[in-house]
Regions:
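Short hydrophobic alpha-helical segments used for membrane anchoring or interfacial signaling
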Residues: 132-134
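A short, conserved, highly charged catalytic patch centered on acidic carboxylates
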Residues: 1-127, 137-184
Length: 184
């Protein structure tokens, strides 16, 4: 179903010139770190993710960022329990806006889809969104428990020569947060 996750396609919010300048600096910062060696999840969170959320105004009220939120849930078969830590969770009034899962440099964002969907199933609402990132690559996920369906965005990367895809990532993130906040 092609229209299940159309929210990431647009129309998307417009970024300010100041936001674009910061996003360009964040891309360059990431590439410098990547060129100097392996980047851990913690480094991605410090040099890219936290500044991205700050630039978009998502670190202050009415939003809250929770780091390393523990989740535990049972699968419908009753025999399997999954548990783990969400790297970051953006919420507004107990409504999960975005689950953020970061992975180390060299890890494929696609490898984190199953883990991220597991976290999304434990969200307090039926529909949730997530962002998976290695710092270099970004993938958005939508999950709807009522429909037993999920969808993926295109993969966005900082290593493209065709501009700064972090701009698009920021726009999609703002769009999904706004949609989530409207439902809260």
């Amino acid at each position: 179903m092609a229209d299940f996750f159309a929210e990431w396609r647009g129309p998307l919010p417009t970024l300010t010139a100041a936001q674009i300048a910061v996003l360009d600096r964040l891309k360059q910062r990431y590439l410098i770190y990547a060129d100097s060696g392996a980047i851990t999840e913690g480094t991605v969170n410090l040099i890219l993710l936290a500044p991205l959320l700050e630039t978009l105004g998502l670190m202050d009220q009415p939003y809250q960022v929770r780091g390393e939120k523990y989740v535990r849930f049972e699968l419908e078969d009753g025999d399997t329990t999954l548990e783990g830590l969400i790297d970051a969770l953006l919420i507004a009034e107990q409504f999960w806006l975005i689950v953020i899962e970061s992975k180390r440099y060299g890890f494929s964002v696609r490898q984190a889809i199953a883990q991220t969907l597991g976290y999304m199933v434990s969200a307090p609402q039926d529909r949730s969104f997530a962002l998976i990132t290695t710092g270099e690559d970004f993938l958005f996920v939508k999950c709807d428990r009522n429909m037993a369906q999920y969808g993926l965005s295109d993969k966005f990367t900082l290593t493209t020569a065709a501009g700064n895809e972090l701009h698009t990532v920021a726009q999609i993130l703002l769009q999904l947060v706004r949609l989530g906040a409207q439902r809260a």
